């Protein structure tokens, strides 16, 4: 405040008192934490760093929409925390490439291929199928789960349908080919059945360990490609169980040393009672009500490890395997307790523990992994680190249903990611996910997708309109027109919407509300643009561009628009107009000129290999890049940038035509050769012998071999004799020619 | 904790207690606030919204490096607050297009063009120049400021230099053409002088108001183009004084109504004493020590408004004009007090007040605007809104010096932005700014720019190397190799650096420290890459790519790398993100492989012409397109897409070095030849003649030509004779060698 004297001479020397504004209570990010089943304020443990571990796929088959449900939602959460809230996220994911499902599937595929390669006789196959049906029927009767039962019945029915025709073919001794086709059909239908049976009988003799790594490596590559296609960011670090076995062994050993694990018959089990009774720990933090649920526990133990003897090794049925002794036919690794392999739950504890240490901020996974997998992970790690906070925030993505039903192979509603991407683009799928909450069930149906498509179209129209407005020619000062009330009001709405969107993202990343707020903002812009149009006035370019850039920016944060992920300084300086043609043509020109220079020298100096290399460049390599070189004698080669697919089709067509031409030429050459051979064969016959073999026409011949009497001994007429004489002379000429050729050796 | 009973039957029904982690005290953004001359914690008034007003340019001439100093630094601050700290920034800037400088410049240009179009006779021009020199000399004598005085003297001198030749041409009645050329030269040199004189005499008769809008509109366009070239983001809203006169009039009226302004002789002045004495207000918040500084105040009143009568209209010399009555020849707008135009300070208060209301978060401007401009803005607005917090945080960018000196037209070190961009790219300028604190003085010198160029090169080589590593063909699972200690350590450094960078940005957006931290991070990566190369192992692609993407992202936030600002959904579906690199590299790869194939055959079949063609492609043709081929014996050629200018400079450098080497080689060969010739010449002398020519040393010789007596006829001592004998024998040997060579003709 001014000094009381009010005297204003040379001015006070001191700046007045200042205090920061009160500001408003900033709304903070809350996340739904499965550890409390509540939305909790999110506080990272160390500044802005967020350590995050997500359970990756078990890689033994194509990834399906259930995977998409989890990995697209976690991708959205990760991007929002990283790019919107600016947390410094360190995101790790594992690949389960050692697992009973993998072992079983690899062994079955291996044994079935071996069986098929031996090309069993029809009868043998029929016998084996019958043998395989016995254990199958037992399993069918024991199955209670309706979905699974239905699936097994379907297999049984298909096998019967394929068996009958083969039996008939065998009984009616049909040809090899017809039997073989029935064999093929039965082999295909009974594949699962036979594989199971072969595995149960021959599984333990399998010693080729490579089959247990080839299968997962293939499906891991497939998984990455699917994720790329869905625009899911790769993890910051990826861990594979097969590469962390030593760390897992140490992890198990320490749990045993800490008194929470015990060795039994070559396997090691986790002592849940011991752990639960300790003051420092709690078992079953996520799903306490599931503790003791044997069915869930068994599923966690893996198909090859739920035999009765395994159960007997445990002190309590609630205990679970940390390390499993391997039976013959199962891959194994050395360890203090004999030869075996990791249990399922321990992998994640060991790998996440190695990378993220004693306490991570976020652990994510699918909803159905809560128990036993995640609860057991928590127990293992808290037993290892002797703490009670291995995971601070546990996030579970909701289920995915297909048109209301659970997705399962039996209901034939099993949709792979590749299938889904044939029907919709990655962006449309992602918009659908954004329009749902990440933690609730998402029904993947035509309705769901229809509303996503509508949304995409609504937004796209808006972007196109704004781009059109921005293209209107205006001088550089014209883009900044004075704001009237409408601009001020639209701008106010814009900032209010941004605040609302911020609030929604703070509320457990509620993207459904965000998408509605974005839709409302676009509607407000549409109203503004229409109002300006009505009074023949140009809408304010800078304001509309700002709003459109904000919406594009949010879509990029959500991964619905691909971010330009180029590295470092863009080459070519600012504003290099990146139309493909203008960009690429200079480089192609250089390639073409270099090729021509090289061909010229090669022709002059007779270096055919270089000419072939130049042709291969034109015909095989460049078409792959959508480039067509057209060589014209004596003229510079014409360079064309064409749509790649069209070009490849053209190449195929050219090859087909060339192939046909080649075949025709070959055909013609063959026929010519045959004619020559026939001609030669004809020339070879001495005229004197030419008629002798025609005993079906003539009965007597003169001394030159010319026929004199026909079959019935009747003397030939003058006309007939004259005609034969002519043939005789013609042959004489040919024969002379033949002798001539034989002389100058032209028959090499 | 587990329930005390330890009984683990069906499991407890309740999840254990959970509490959020303590987390660490997040470091918050502090900004240096000129209102306290301290770094203050930055708290926006309403959630994440940040209202921000920046004083834009007075548009009457080309923008210079002083402008760049302010607008690049504010662009960096704005981008960091918007894209890094994710504040919801609303950034307004004005264009001063009504101002005494504009009025004077427009009128002078107008009158001078009229004078020139009348094509004055030589004699008339000479007379007028003399007339104009009178007031000019008065002004020169009155000028105290050393810079200004030097500039006026320079003009005076130049005019004299141009006057003499014209006078002579007139006296010696030279041809029309010669006279005209002298007239043109004098007109050009005396332009400022004549314009001033014409304006002082004819200014008041100018009535064509359009000249007062054409000049600023032109230079506003020029300013926007310069900003675009510097990659400075356009403001969210731009206000022009000429479009806000009604709002300004109301603003002045309300200040008068509130009792802080008074009308005097058609102008309106701000009553600083009244304002300062009020309990609710303080005057001179930014620079209290400058209150009363008449010189500074006068500069704020504008060149046309500091006449003595204007001063007499003020109640106190500290008062300043809110509204100025317009004199003839000055543009004017209707208002309650007759015809006039806005004062300088009131524009910003009125425009910012209209858009941002009673209290904004940030006001920015150049350091030398603190007093009187910004202090008067504060007074006006707080008088209007009757509050004491019109601006919460006042940010001033530091000065710019040119190689240590103040930039000024008189010192001829006045560098326009266009000049600067001819010498360096916008990115290099921005890197230089980033490597300095935004609030301190920045010296624009070759040193400053050299360190920026070094920095750019250091980063660019890193990006190129990472891109080369990422191109190494690896199957899709290969990009995720298991982390060893080196990867874990590099990753730890990476996250520590990100934390350090966050801390530096919180500390008043200290980009200088950030750039050093980024440099250190690159060095750590280089060490890691070198270590992996040393043990013939591939570096971890995913980790290096992550780090490179982070650095690129930070450079984009700082505006040093252009952001892809396309709107909406990219055309052409996913993966067509048209980064030049991704687009062009496949074609370059094909060119490189074709070249390698051709070189291989050419070497095998000894076709040197093709090898020369391949070298020419690498050395002459591809650099033009910014492509660098690096051939490594026995390894595939490394393809690098580099900035074209850098590459051409490199090629020039390479040629210069090769040229130098060639010259050195030639030089050495020439010297060698000379030595050999000298040696040969020496060998040719028969020993008998070798001393004969040395008559300055010896007077008598024996029969073999050996000297016996010195110059004075004195016999040589034994020692001397012995020494000469030795020389004689050495020459004998050489001579024999020479005869030998002559015989076997080795002198072609």
UniProtKB/Swiss-Prot annotation, chains A, B:
The modification N6-acetyllysine is found at residue 503. Zn(2+) binds at residues 55, 348, 373, 377. A motif ('KIIK' region) lies at residues 101-104. ATP binds at residue 409. Changing residue 359 to L: In MDBH; 84% reduction of cysteine-tRNA ligase activity. One of its GO terms (molecular function) is identical protein binding. InterPro entries: Cys-tRNA-ligase (IPR015803), Cys-tRNA/MSH_ligase (IPR024909), Rossmann-like_a/b/a_fold (IPR014729), tRNA-synt_1_cat_dom (IPR032678), tRNAsynth_Ia_anticodon-bd (IPR009080). GO terms for cellular component: cytoplasm; cytosol. L-cysteine binds at residues 56, 96, 373. It catalyses: tRNA(Cys) + L-cysteine + ATP = L-cysteinyl-tRNA(Cys) + AMP + diphosphate. A motif ('KMSKS' region) lies at residues 406-410. It is found in: Cytoplasm. The keyword Protein biosynthesis applies. Binds 1 zinc ion per subunit. Its EC number is 6.1.1.16. The modification Phosphoserine is found at residues 19, 305, 307, 746. The modification N-acetylalanine is found at residue 2. A motif ('HIGH' region) lies at residues 57-67. Keywords: Acetylation, Aminoacyl-tRNA synthetase, ATP-binding, Chromosomal rearrangement, Cytoplasm, Disease variant, Dwarfism, Ligase, Metal-binding, Nucleotide-binding, Phosphoprotein, Protein biosynthesis, Proto-oncogene, Zinc. Homodimer. Belongs to the class-I aminoacyl-tRNA synthetase family. This is Cysteine--tRNA ligase, cytoplasmic. It comes from Homo sapiens.
